[in-house]
Amino acid sequence: MDPSQNPRDLCQIYLEKFMVISNYRSLSFKKQKYLVIDKLSNYNNTDYRDVLQVNGYFTYCVQKNKLDAIQYLYENNLMNPENKSQLFKIAIVHGNIDVLKLVIDYGIDVSLDDHFAITVCTRPISNTENIIQLLIDNGADVTSNNNLPIKFAILKGTINKSVLDLLINNGADIHADEYFCAKYAAKCCYIFALKYIINLGIDVNMENGILLKNVLSDTAYSSNEYTYSCIKTLLENGADISFLDDNDTLKMCRGSKTRNILILLLDYGFDISFINEYQVKDSSKLSEINKILDQGIDPIKFILFTNEI
């Protein structure tokens, strides 16, 4: 896989593979055992029915921890390389470390399918840390595809300190690809990940305040609580608000739902005097407001009333 490809696109490819494997239906063990054994004896990977039945049987064995059934397939030479690969990936997706140990003992290459296992196992699955360590002990590369495993962990929701620690202690670079993880954590308001990366000593003012700008960029679409927490964390760790321009904060000045964020920035000295230079695009609106104020209405109370601050 091309490591220069956009990390988000790469992660999406692995996520799609993950979802395909996780959707194999678990088949009845008693009803399917002999049928599947027969199919494995004459396996046709171009027949989707064969593929679904075999992988469904593998899924059942993994979910129910049927180690004896899996051993039977190996000992009777019923597993071709493709079947072995699929069983391994199904065990990864379902987090079954017993099956993983078994297929590793039978010689599976843990880096198959362009390091699928070490990448997707950073998602929240059972035995995450033990599985990562098992893969590393058997040759998995946590820096594969330009450190994609740790990017996948950040992008796809494994906000888990022990998992991130394990990856980093085994060589993963969370600052790879021009601090992609930090920038993405800020943009998506992943507060734990952002704090974790800051604690590693990152420059919160990198690239002219890109982290603070990233947090503010999707304010309208993210949770106000997480946005506020991320901005507060950056400011408390020395983020310089002078990097912000008028466009970065204009929407917060206009929206009552983001007023708490605006107040937070003001507490740190943010200057919004540019509002005085605002040019009214629709003069009719200005005349409407003036007509209302001519009734003796207090401008401050009018703002409070109409914006429900």
Swiss-Prot record:
Instruction: Write out the entry's keywords from A to Z.
Output: ANK repeat, Repeat
Q: Where is the signal peptide?
A: none
Q: In which domain of life is the source organism classified?
A: Viruses
Please list the residue ranges covered by the ANK repeats.
53-82, 83-112, 114-144, 145-176, 177-206, 214-243, 245-274
Classification via SUPFAM superfamilies: Ankyrin repeat
What Gene3D superfamilies does its record include? Ankyrin repeat-containing domain
What the entry lists under PANTHER family is as follows:
ANKYRIN REPEAT AND PROTEIN KINASE DOMAIN-CONTAINING PROTEIN, ANKYRIN REPEAT-CONTAINING PROTEIN-RELATED
Protein name in the entry: Putative ankyrin repeat protein R603
